[in-house]
């Protein structure tokens, strides 16, 4: 884990996260001071002396499909934070002026069809509607059978994508936290008792047919 993950925007910085060619057990961070062996607290805490809007991190990506060459993820603060307009300004500048191959918009599954979500999708369609776009629908582990419908929620997003005129979009239903726990278990990465209990719950959830997210992905990837 190299960055904070919260429902609310938690930093006013652009994080550039680079993959390393091999695993050496070290994670480097450039946040005002270059640290070639940054520990967890260093990674989770922004340096108050950094007057720029950027933080760079270099680490090995534990990709289940293996490494495929150099990769940089640019993580933005978010745009829907009414508590800090700076976050929205930094993010919009990155979206409008940034040079990237693909834009990933993380959709909170619990906030689908809200006014904020629709307004931002409209903004993306107007500014980047022709570019490759991934809508990662996160937190689907929070859906409850009989109350929520994954298929209907995803179809609602596809309907917005079509109506707003996105030309090159895909929708990827995910549970980032379930994936995080699963990878910690696979790599024997010091899971605590609470995390093991949570992983057991996630496993039970995603064994159910209605939570089979693989059903929404193509069987073959070009």
Residue ranges and their predicted role:
Residues 1-219:
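Globular "head" domains of long coiled-coil molecular machines
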């Amino acid at each position: 884990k190299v960055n904070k993950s919260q429902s609310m925007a938690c930093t006013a910085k652009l994080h550039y996260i680079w993959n390393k060619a091999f695993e050496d057990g070290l994670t480097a961070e450039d946040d005002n001071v270059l640290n070639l062996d940054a520990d967890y607290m260093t990674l989770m805490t922004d340096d108050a002396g950094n007057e720029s809007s950027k933080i760079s991190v270099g680490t090995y990506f534990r990709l289940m499909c293996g490494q495929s060459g150099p990769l940089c993820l640019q993580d933005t603060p978010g745009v829907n934070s009414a508590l800090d307009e700076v976050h929205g300004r930094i993010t919009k500048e990155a979206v409008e002026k940034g040079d990237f191959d693909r834009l990933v918009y993380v959709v909170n599954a619990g906030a689908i069809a809200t006014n904020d979500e629709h307004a931002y999708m409209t903004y993306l369609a107007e500014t980047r509607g022709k570019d490759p776009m991934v809508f990662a629908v996160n937190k689907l582990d929070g859906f409850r059978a009989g109350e929520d419908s994954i298929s209907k929620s995803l179809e609602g997003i596809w309907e917005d994508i079509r109506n707003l005129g996105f030309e090159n979009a895909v929708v990827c239903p995910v549970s980032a936290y379930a994936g995080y726990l699963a990878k910690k278990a696979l790599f024997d990465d010091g899971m605590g008792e609470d995390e093991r209990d949570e992983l057991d719950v996630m496993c039970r959830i995603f064994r159910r047919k209605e939570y089979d997210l693989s059903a929404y992905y193509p069987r073959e990837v070009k």
